[in-house]
Amino acid sequence: MYEESSCFDPNSMVDNNGGFCAAETTFTVSHQFQPPLGSTTNSFDDDLKLPTMDEFSVFPSVISLPNSETQNQNISNNNHLINQMIQESNWGVSEDNSNFFMNTSHPNTTTTPIPDLLSLLHLPRCSMSLPSSDIMAGSCFTYDPLFHLNLPPQPPLIPSNDYSGYLLGIDTNTTTQRDESNVGDENNNAQFDSGIIEFSKEIRRKGRGKRKNKPFTTERERRCHLNERYEALKLLIPSPSKGDRASILQDGIDYINELRRRVSELKYLVERKRCGGRHKNNEVDDNNNNKNLDDHGNEDDDDDDENMEKKPESDVIDQCSSNNSLRCSWLQRKSKVTEVDVRIVDDEVTIKVVQKKKINCLLLVSKVLDQLQLDLHHVAGGQIGEHYSFLFNTKIYEGSTIYASAIANRVIEVVDKHYMASLPNSNY
């Protein structure tokens, strides 16, 4: 059954203690290795005459036993010891432990002698045969060849909780129970017991509070929105001067100030009208009372009535003078060819008109002032470059209700209309 070689002794000795047979450990080479005479070219294996792996096996395939009963008994004992050592180890049986195990558990078992030539190749002196399928199933995942490198633990290849236990050699029932107990618990230390961090969807991110989603706008959208605002402001201004943003803002500020002055002016006119009506009613009452007193012909009574009637009249006059503040307003309006400046101080109105010198607006403005019930007191004019400049000093008639915006709008309307009418004649 075995191939005989010059270094193998077929007469094996049987050990009565362990039941194994072992060859002699000391040997001498009987003769040198020489190639056969009949062949001139031999293979590398024939020249070296390497023994097969069966010659180095320590199991019964290369050991001759006296009988079959002792052979079966020794095999069962060896399997029992191998299973016990594998279960006690944490990360598998290393090569040194296996050699120690073979030397201690079977002291009488020795390997077959190896020639001196083969010792130079550093071949293994003994090879442990593969154990049963149960041992392989238990040790395939317990032995880690990278354990001595002290590498950090790696997450499982399959992130699912159902298969993580299968890949790590852990029962899936215990894994799912642990995951169920850790759902919603962010500070639970049980996730790090095995040295592997398990990432799952149930682990919620820590936050400092609810954050409201702010609308994100691009720079282009912001510019479009700002342009729309400027266009809306431009539509609110009655007579915008230019279309640029700075001019629109200035025109808007001027228009707001004009509205404020108009409000204050209207309040003054209303208060003045109330005081004027009260004063007229008091004068009528005074005349009627004086007539009645003359009919009675009682001088003493007349003196008393006059003293009584003077008090209400003086009270009304003082009330009107105290309630009426000094009226003051100022307004500027511009068009393509005309610029009007109106200033009102109490009942005096000063109007300044500047226009191009193609037309003469002096007569037109004078007619407009008469229509607005303004008493013209003084007019001054002159030429400044290509423009005419006129200054009108007027006074508001008593009982008239007029304000600066109405004067400016009317003057600009008339002057611009006359200027547009005179353009075709000047072209010819």
UniProtKB/Swiss-Prot annotation:
<feature type="region of interest" description="Disordered">
    <location>
        <begin position="278"/>
        <end position="320"/>
    </location>
</feature>
<dbReference type="InterPro" id="IPR045895">
    <property type="entry name" value="bHLH91-like"/>
</dbReference>
<dbReference type="GO" id="GO:0003677">
    <property type="term" value="F:DNA binding"/>
</dbReference>
<dbReference type="GO" id="GO:0005634">
    <property type="term" value="C:nucleus"/>
</dbReference>
<protein>
    <recommendedName>
        <fullName>Transcription factor bHLH91</fullName>
    </recommendedName>
</protein>
<dbReference type="Pfam" id="PF00010">
    <property type="entry name" value="HLH"/>
</dbReference>
<dbReference type="InterPro" id="IPR036638">
    <property type="entry name" value="HLH_DNA-bd_sf"/>
</dbReference>
<dbReference type="GO" id="GO:0009555">
    <property type="term" value="P:pollen development"/>
</dbReference>
<comment type="subunit">
    <text>Homodimer.</text>
</comment>
<keyword id="KW-0238">DNA-binding</keyword>
<dbReference type="GO" id="GO:0006355">
    <property type="term" value="P:regulation of DNA-templated transcription"/>
</dbReference>
<keyword id="KW-0539">Nucleus</keyword>
<dbReference type="GO" id="GO:0046983">
    <property type="term" value="F:protein dimerization activity"/>
</dbReference>
<dbReference type="GO" id="GO:0048658">
    <property type="term" value="P:anther wall tapetum development"/>
</dbReference>
<dbReference type="InterPro" id="IPR045896">
    <property type="entry name" value="MYC1-like_bHLH"/>
</dbReference>
<keyword id="KW-0804">Transcription</keyword>
<dbReference type="GO" id="GO:0003700">
    <property type="term" value="F:DNA-binding transcription factor activity"/>
</dbReference>
<dbReference type="GO" id="GO:0052543">
    <property type="term" value="P:callose deposition in cell wall"/>
</dbReference>
<dbReference type="InterPro" id="IPR011598">
    <property type="entry name" value="bHLH_dom"/>
</dbReference>
<feature type="compositionally biased region" description="Acidic residues">
    <location>
        <begin position="297"/>
        <end position="307"/>
    </location>
</feature>
<keyword id="KW-0805">Transcription regulation</keyword>
<feature type="domain" description="bHLH">
    <location>
        <begin position="210"/>
        <end position="259"/>
    </location>
</feature>
